[in-house]
Amino acid sequence: ACDNCSVAQYKVEYSISTQENVLDVWKVGCISEGVPVCDGTYPFSIEVSLIWVATDSTRRLNVEELNSSDYIEGDFTDQEVFGEFMSLKQVEMKTIEAKYDGPYRPATTRPKSLVSSEDVKGASKKKNSS
């Protein structure tokens, strides 16, 4: 299912500091309630660019560590999986790129904690070889 679905992309500037923020990030991923479900899962992945922050106050990060970032990508089938994933990462999230496989529906509301959101023009077509 979900062959040749259109992909809508968003780039989101976001800062995450609390568990409540994690839920906001998930809302960004869903953009709108009623995102089409394909084969029992939400048909989108969230690509996250992260800058790690120190969790141990006795240790300072050096400049190289502060400037380095890790890039991760994951497919999250539900909010619980996503929340568990984020809880394992003591991070400050700098950018989120969410891709949606399926009919695009614009968001009716956006989380207040969103710094900025930008629609990436020229949504591409994606084929899943499943």
From Swiss-Prot:
InterPro entries: Viral_movement
Region feature (Disordered): 100-130
A Pfam family reported for this protein in Swiss-Prot or TrEMBL: MP
Source domain of life: Viruses
Protein name: 29 kDa protein
